Amino acid sequence: MTKALIVFASMTGTTEGIAEILAQDLRELKIDTLVKECTELYPDEFLDYDICVVATYTYGADGDLPEEAEDFYYDMEEVDLTGKVFGVLGSGDRIYKKFCPAVDDFDEQFEKSHAIRGAEPLKINLSPDQTDKENIKQFARDLVTTSSKVQKPK
């Protein structure tokens, strides 16, 4: 069975909620899915999963990574995720000049780790509305479709 790990950083609960919506969508697609907060694990735990996801918020007007996610972000530099499928999604506020740059930062970090993009980065303004929930469902489908095309080691 295909396994997914969703790692999240959430200050107000919004991004955790987004991670849970994605987890439910993946489970409906028959993916064994685990959701964990970024402070509860190290990036090398992604090695035990086929699909690797980060759900993050962006902090402040300068578009910073969440402080609690910084160690996880930098530790990702040490992990080779070749053959793993990844996706990044998160929330931000369009009032700021930079919208969800933490999503882009994690997306780039996955690329540097040699993972395979399974879905385009998904950015949600504030909290998910019905359209966002449909986009999350499509994000899940894209991850699963890409994962099904990746040659699994024997």
Residue ranges of predicted features:
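FMN-binding flavodoxin-like domain, especially the glycine-rich phosphate-binding loop
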Residues: 2-3, 14-17, 25, 29, ...
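Short, hydrophobic/glycine-enriched beta-strand segments
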Residues: 4-9
